[in-house]
Amino acid sequence: MTSFQEVPLQTSNFAHVIFQNVAKSYLPNAHLECHYTLTPYIHPHPKDWVGIFKVGWSTARDYYTFLWSPMPEHYVEGSTVNCVLAFQGYYLPNDDGEFYQFCYVTHKGEIRGASTPFQFRASSPVEELLTMEDEGNSDMLVVTTKAGLLELKIEKTMKEKEELLKLIAVLEKETAQLREQVGRMERELNHEKERCDQLQAEQKGLTEVTQSLKMENEEFKKRFSDATSKAHQLEEDIVSVTHKAIEKETELDSLKDKLKKAQHEREQLECQLKTEKDEKELYKVHLKNTEIENTKLMSEVQTLKNLDGNKESVITHFKEEIGRLQLCLAEKENLQRTFLLTTSSKEDTFFLKEQLRKAEEQVQATRQEVVFLAKELSDAVNVRDRTMADLHTARLENEKVKKQLADAVAELKLNAMKKDQDKTDTLEHELRREVEDLKLRLQMAADHYKEKFKECQRLQKQINKLSDQSANNNNVFTKKMGNQQKVNDASVNTDPATSASTVDVKPSPSAAEADFDIVTKGQVCEMTKEIADKTEKYNKCKQLLQDEKAKCNKYADELAKMELKWKEQVKIAENVKLELAEVQDNYKLQLAEKDKEISGLTSHLENLSREKELKRSLENQAERKMEGQNSQSPQCLKTCSEQNGYVLTLSNAQPVLQYGNPYASQETRDGADGAFYPDEIQRPPVRVPSWGLEDNVVCSQPARNLSRPDGLEDSEDSKEDENAPTAPDPPSQHLRGHGTGFCFDSSFDVHKKCPLCELMFPPNYDQSKFEEHVESHWKVCPMCSEQFPPDYDQQVFERHVQTHFDQNVLNFD
């Protein structure tokens, strides 16, 4: 039994199983025993097997024959076990001159042990003989058989085994004695500890008596603390060592988990790549759809702009018509006044009133058309605002989709780069592993080559010795033959009997010489054959070594190429990162440009909204002008007639409209005003105006309506410009110097300001409350709800109220 030195075998998988007593050659058809040792680094399994492989195998399937490895009895995990397998002779290979080796293969197909190479050769008489030096320190060589040599070795090993067993028994006895001593020492230590505790208790009791005992007690405490600290330190060291072992195990488990996670993440990344490709296609389709929608929205915006231009042209046209109608109305009022001055007949007044009513109907119709056009304009502006908002949201969605598409493309590129890098890493790892395997095989082949070379040198020495021995034997034989010839020549003439005897003796040395020559020739032939075989095997091994070197060079070149490819991939990854940074910068610039466009569009929308408000305010001012003209013309006539003393009697029944008012249903008011119908229109009394300018003539404002017309905003409720004329005729312009009408418009002011008391209101103050505050300063007629300025003459106001009770004036319900 050969002893072997323990080394850290966990570094190589081929050293987890060690094969013992492997010979250099075995008989082909004889039973073969395989001795091997299972190290603590392998866990046996019933499906493990030992196979005979030809040298140069690549996988576990290249076995020649195999036997199942038996499960060792009473196996303890982490211990070494010796096992034996017996291969039957008819399963073994023949004498083919190839090298074989034992390999231990696990149930997972992993090769965990390999033996030294050996051959299967038939025994020859020369091979059974061995030469060895004499143990008696003599220069002679002793020729023995292999069996004898092996028996001697077995006897020596058995003796060594017996000696080792005796030594083991002695060592076991010594260990038992040492264990008993350790137990005794531990008991003594425990006894001493108990005694120490007792002494400490006694010392604590005596501390109150003497100060010296206190000092000794402190010294004992210090010693005890040192011992305990050492014990704690040792315990901590033990705990740290155990923690390190546990950490190593956890690191191994974590590495396994990381490997599993990496495989799982690889599968997830492949799935994610597929999904991202699908999302990329969907993004492309969505991008195309959004571009189509953008084009549609742009076309709709263009059509709405065209409609807006058409509406503006229609509004300008109607404004021109309103101006023309105002001029016509002014001319008609002038004609009415001239007719009132020239004639006082009822028929003329009826005709003039009829014309005035028709003009008022036309003005009212145009006013309703203006209101409808304002509604349509507001609807068009709202539609345009909605389309602009939709366009803005579509652009934002488009930019968002583009950003997502760019991010997806970048992620795809990064994933592709990561996968390529992983592939290169795995390939590099595999190539390195193959190079290490080839280096190991080269080392094994070199060792085998050295052994064969040494054997060849030894055989060459034996051949030289045999040739020297044969030459010496030939020289001795020739000397003997020469001496014998001389003796024969000397005794020829003496006795014929002796000559006959010499003749009879002569053939015996020739036969011995012939036998010796035959034996030496046979040995020389066998030695030459063996030398030829050895040289052939040497050449084969040399060729294999050269092939392995060529393969190593080839793999080294491939490794260099793979490193170059990896560097190129790294450069490509850096370029891709730079491109991504440039794309991000361009995208940020595009975002800034889009923000500028959005800000420009918002400013444009604000300008459009301001223009819209200006248009509405202008329309409202035009409406107020028309209302002021319609209401101020009879009021001026009334005041002039009152001052001159002329009162015209009007019939109680108002004329009915010839074609009716087509906008009567839409002209309804809320509150106390009610609806204006032709038969319910009430006017103040009219008298002949006098053009004297001595007294102050006040043109009162029309009655203010507390309700808003349909389709108009709060900021555009019935307001009138302060600089607007009260009447279009020259007399009204002259009267403007004595009394002016009240008008305010809050759409142009940031804060609302009362024009009478100078009180400021916030911009978001309710318009109806603001109007109530302003109206509270005015004098209101309790009958007709007509408003008068605060500085209006009280007597004139009372006279106005009294006119409602006159018999010649229409009653106001």
UniProtKB/Swiss-Prot annotation:
Zn(2+) 1 binds at residues 754, 757, 773, 777. Gene3D superfamilies: 2.60.40.2840, 6.20.250.40. Keywords: Apoptosis, Coiled coil, Cytoplasm, Cytoplasmic vesicle, Metal-binding, Mitochondrion, Phosphoprotein, Repeat, Zinc, Zinc-finger. Residues 489-502 have a biased composition (Polar residues). It is found in: Cytoplasm; Mitochondrion; Preautophagosomal structure; Cytoplasmic vesicle, Autophagosome. Homooligomer. Interacts with TNFAIP3. Interacts with STARD13. Interacts with MYO6. Interacts with TOM1; the interaction is indirect and is mediated by MYO6, which acts as a bridge between TOM1 and TAX1BP1. Interacts with MAVS; this interaction induces MAVS polyubiquitination. Interacts with TNIP1. Interacts with TRAF6; this interaction mediates deubiquitination of TRAF6 and inhibition of NF-kappa-B activation. Interacts with RIPK1; this interaction negatively regulates RIPK1 ubiquitination. Interacts with NBR1. Interacts with TBK1. Interacts with RB1CC1. Interacts with SQSTM1. This is Tax1-binding protein 1 homolog. It comes from Pongo abelii. The gene is TAX1BP1.
